[in-house]
């Protein structure tokens, strides 16, 4: 039941982000949350605090990378909950050609309904290939 509810919530939150509204995502963040996106591409880094996460999300929306949820597994007590989210992310160029198509897993820790930390695992070579494409074809999107 908990996983079902978590999937409904996260699916709605991600649908809002796809629509350009990051407020629901930020509402789930604890003020001192931490977010890690491994790799060596323009998306990679360790981000601390809601404001840092907001800037990362603003770029995601500005660039137009889309995310969706396939499955959520959630467990634990309200003061020490873990959520694992499996989904996909993609980006189409202006001609409608799918340039980026990736799978991800998010491992998140929550306390009282707020995300305190999460890490995204995905094929970082695909993220680098997106960077390479944007640098060659859409350089304005590379600006942070």
Protein language model features and the residues they cover:
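Preference for short coil/turn "hinge" residues that link or interrupt alpha-helices
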Residues: 19-21, 26, 40, 93, ...
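A solvent-exposed, acidic/Ser-Thr-rich amphipathic alpha-helical stretch
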Residues: 23-76
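A general structural signal for well-ordered alpha-helical segments in protein cores
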Residues: 10, 53, 82-83
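Short, flexible active-site loop motifs that bind/organize anionic cofactors or intermediates
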Residues: 12-15, 43, 117
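A beta-strand edge to alpha-helix "cap/lid" segment located at domain peripheries
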Residues: 1-5, 58-144
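Short, low-complexity N-terminal intrinsically disordered segments enriched in polar/charged residues
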Residues: 1-31, 136-144
